[in-house]
Swiss-Prot record:
Residue ranges, annotated region (Catalytic): 242-533
Organism: Prochlorococcus marinus (strain MIT 9312)
Amino-acid positions noted as binding Zn(2+) in the UniProt annotation, renumbered to this chain: C333, H384, H510
Protein name listed in UniProt: Threonine--tRNA ligase
Domain TGS: 1-61
Reaction(s) catalysed by this chain's protein: tRNA(Thr) + L-threonine + ATP = L-threonyl-tRNA(Thr) + AMP + diphosphate + H(+)
NCBIfam families found in the cross-reference section: thrS (TIGR00418)
Cell compartments where the protein resides: Cytoplasm
Amino acid sequence: MPIITLPDGSKKVFEKSVTILEIAQSIGAGLAKATIAGKVNDVLIDATLPIKNDSKVVIITSKDKEGIEIIRHSFAHLIGHAVKQIYSDIKMAIGPVIEDGFYYDIFSEQRFTPEDLIKIENRINKLIKTNYDVEILQVSKEEAIKTFKERDETFKLRIIEEIPEEGLINLYKHEEYIDMCRGPHVPNTRHLRHFKLLKLSGSYWRGNSENEALQRIYGTAWAKEKELKDYLTRIEEAEKRDHRKLGKKHSLFHIQEESPGMIFWHPNGWTIYQVLEKYIREILKKNDYLEIKTPQAVDKSLWEKSGHWEKFRDDMFTTASENRTYAIKPMNCPCHIQLFNQGLKSYKDLPIRLAEFGSCHRNEPSGALHGLMRVRNFTQDDAHIFCKEEQIQEEVSTFIDLVFEVYKTFGFDEIIIKLSTRPEKRVGSEEIWDKSEEALTKALDNKNLKWELQPGEGAFYGPKIEFSLKDCLNRVWQCGTIQVDFSMPIRLEATYVDIDNEKRNPVMLHRAILGSFERFIGILIEQYEAKFPIWLAPYQIILLSITDRNNEKCLKFNELINNNGYRSKVDIRNEKIGYKIREATISRIPLIAVIGDKEEEIDSVALRALDGTNLGIFNLPNLYKLMDELIDKKGRTE
């Protein structure tokens, strides 16, 4: 007689084993109809599995986060059901849930096309309408092998090989189609309604390019039709803002197969990069950082001492010379300690803040590379603060102010903050962990900031704070971080002399604001849709001549504007002025200055903004004044 305790504390007694669906039915028919799965003593299970013992039970519906994930996972199985009905010689690989959706990797000799995607989606819709029950079969490993051998499912058999002998394996039966999964899944396809197959792409079994090539079908699913429509609108907007498309359209950068994950910056993109670097450099100088530069290739002995060789060797690019092995640096911190170690340091010298625009290389898998967002060569706005334990709070507090100042400069006003604390496996005494976590907590609380605690998510060498931006599409980008490190200064023998004339190891704070220049510029391209605020724009103003008579004045003004430190260009082609204005607008140049006979007579320009607003007639001094005001505002929304 299991006693079931519900979330409100009420209890229900059943005479025999009971399922989640039966519990829901005992509460009400409406709840039973909405039930997707359940949580039994905090473990998700299928709605039709029996509960034999006293348990705490939560009923899961599509309103719950777990509910929508179960719906998405069930849709992945529906892809398998549909493609197996349509095509022969198909073998199913894996079909997990991902953020906002799902995918299935499939082996097929036939290459899927967009027309196939439509065909598969139509078949899924047809299957859904039959409202069939999804059965769960809990079988032994031997039975699972037999089932998938009969179906010639090579990839499923490989997965089963890795499963321990003991215990049962969950198989899910969609009419004639059988798949394998931890589950849970929906009990009936009536719960599967609002979905869309999105795209096709290539992949490899286990993500290894030496394995079989697979085809991946992506989809999304939601509890309500409106949620699906809203998501598809966001996807459409995101595609419009895709930094890879805009980067090509506006000649900002490109990537070639000969150098995967490494950026060829075009003049327009490099201008943005340089403006960004100049701004960060000014901020660092104002906050008493010392800018340094360290080598690209460093003998592996340093990486062995720092611990990176053991943990990150596979992610490093290496080279050899004169019987020595070098790693192209994947991060800057060990090199920064080498600089700190030059010369004796006193407690009076601390804190020491060393900053570098450090070019790093990491051997990311080719399948994970994504434009500017995931690259193999990137530049960090990296800095390391060497300080005493009692200085941690003040340094973190100052850095938080710096982060908010920079993000607001670019128009990011919504910042998400997370504090990650000690993991189970860690170095350092409990006392120093207590002090560090308290320092980080106080630094946040003293500023009345909202933040989220992530217990156990800190690195083994210290707690950290992460700063994430929310963009115009409500996407979250983790960029900034400040990380306490007790370990590396000890490993690499960084010391200072304290007030008692004793040698001590400093605490090292790893910190970055942008994260990497490449990724941050990618975020900015999408945030602004390449309509950069004037301070960042590759060209800030373009001068257009109405007729050939005005070309000389255009060229003269262009020279004067550039000589005054602005970025200007001209369009003196023999084209109609309307065409030139359209071209300048498409090029996303913030200010468009037209010079005709009238303007030339009064030594001025007719100025308009990128959005078409007529700003009026400006002589050069007034134009400079306006441009300075706009540049000073940068990208701030206030």
